[in-house]
């Protein structure tokens, strides 16, 4: 992978001044995306449908909000319900972004992208990376999938969809409320009202948050909890309970959109964290782990798939599980079953 990762501009989420070039470019960007969406809504650009239900998971903000844990949870739940889901993804950060390919658990991250490889590794589902999400969806259907999950595809209007799920960071929300590059918004925040479901990633904080009750149509702020309870040695040994590290110091590594969230989850389990934050989608080298002290190194699974070539007995991945209310799954599966009956799937 040639990309070295991405960092979020601070002014998106705090009160620091927005650079003048960003303020000038934001209205231009806004006009362009408004025109593009209008072309699709009025039928001047065609949306293409595949013969199975399509779920789009995405967000109106740039950067990570928890889409990958939710996508993994969706795949697993659909598999349990008897579906054969496939995942369509762009495969951000891979070296040959113009090449479409199947991604499996052992696909090099440089070819498949960190998130698609993680999804394939965790679920065993068919995963197709392609800059053309429609082509990816068609390939998945041809491969026998009876439902397609389009990861990070909210703005990919060429692919018609049956269900849209918006994922929101429960702490940052929509930041300063401005469009790119002055703020984090890919589209105006009002775009989220068109989505069928809104999943709010509250991390561990959701354990004390008041529940939100969605309306009868299924739309509402469904809360997603992220939980950790084990560590997986990256040298192939059996997983161990995370509690075995309580009271110990560890190096914690996170190359994700919001590294502090991962560090806070470890601290909440009584672990002494020496934090090491890297840019989102960072490409790791063995030298990145020369910390000067020999302590266990804990990292997210998204980071772990990129460190497999040089893993040793000191490296551990921390499985992350997305938990949503039972009512969310009932509402979603009911909608999908109705769609399938109409489409003859």
From Swiss-Prot:
GO terms for biological process: lipid A biosynthetic process; lipopolysaccharide core region biosynthetic process. It catalyses: a lipid A disaccharide + ATP = a lipid IVA + ADP + H(+). ATP binds at residues 61-68. GO terms for molecular function: ATP binding; tetraacyldisaccharide 4'-kinase activity. InterPro entries: LpxK, P-loop_NTPase. The keyword Lipid metabolism applies. Pathway: Glycolipid biosynthesis; lipid IV(A) biosynthesis; lipid IV(A) from (3R)-3-hydroxytetradecanoyl-[acyl-carrier-protein] and UDP-N-acetyl-alpha-D-glucosamine: step 6/6. Its EC number is 2.7.1.130. It comes from the Bacteria. Keywords: ATP-binding, Kinase, Lipid A biosynthesis, Lipid biosynthesis, Lipid metabolism, Nucleotide-binding, Transferase. The keyword Transferase applies. It is an enzyme of class 2 (transferase). One of its GO terms (cellular component) is plasma membrane. NCBIfam families: lpxK. Transfers the gamma-phosphate of ATP to the 4'-position of a tetraacyldisaccharide 1-phosphate intermediate (termed DS-1-P) to form tetraacyldisaccharide 1,4'-bis-phosphate (lipid IVA). Belongs to the LpxK family. This is Tetraacyldisaccharide 4'-kinase. It comes from Xanthomonas euvesicatoria pv. vesicatoria (strain 85-10).
């Amino acid at each position: 992978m040639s990309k070295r990762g991405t960092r979020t501009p601070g002014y998106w989420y705090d009160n620091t001044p927005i650079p003048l070039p960003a303020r000038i470019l934001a209205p231009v960007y806004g006009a362009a995306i408004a025109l593009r969406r209008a072309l699709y809504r009025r039928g001047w650009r065609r949306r293409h449908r595949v013969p199975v239900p399509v779920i789009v998971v995405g967000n109106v903000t740039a950067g990570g909000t928890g889409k990958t844990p939710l996508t993994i949870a969706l795949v697993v739940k659909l598999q349990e319900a008897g579906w054969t889901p496939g995942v369509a993804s762009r495969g951000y950060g891979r070296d040959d972004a113009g090449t479409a390919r199947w991604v499996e658990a052992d696909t090099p991250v440089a070819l498949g992208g960190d998130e698609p490889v993680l999804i394939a590794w965790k679920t065993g589902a068919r995963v197709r990376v392609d800059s053309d999400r429609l082509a990816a969806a068609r390939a998945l259907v041809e491969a026998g999938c009876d439902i397609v999950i389009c990861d990070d595809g909210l703005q990919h209007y060429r692919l018609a969809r049956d269900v849209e799920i918006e994922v929101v960071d429960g702490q940052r929300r929509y930041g300063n409320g401005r469009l790119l590059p002055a703020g984090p918004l890919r589209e105006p925040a009002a775009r989220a009202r068109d989505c069928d479901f809104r999943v709010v990633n509250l991390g561990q904080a959701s354990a004390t948050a008041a529940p939100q009750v969605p309306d009868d149509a299924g739309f509402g702020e469904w809360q997603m909890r992220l939980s950790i309870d084990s560590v997986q040695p990256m040298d192939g040994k059996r997983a161990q309970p995370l509690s075995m590290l309580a009271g110990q110091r560890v190096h914690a590594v996170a190359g994700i959109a919001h590294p502090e969230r991962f560090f806070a989850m470890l601290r909440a389990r009584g672990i002494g964290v020496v934090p090491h934050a890297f840019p989102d989608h960072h490409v790791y080298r063995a030298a990145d782990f020369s910390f000067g002290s020999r302590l266990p190194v804990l990292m997210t699974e998204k980071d772990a798939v990129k460190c497999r070539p040089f893993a040793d007995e000191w490296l551990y991945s921390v499985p992350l599980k997305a938990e949503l209310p039972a009512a969310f799954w009932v509402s979603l599966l009911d909608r999908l079953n109705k769609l399938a009956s109409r489409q003859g799937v």
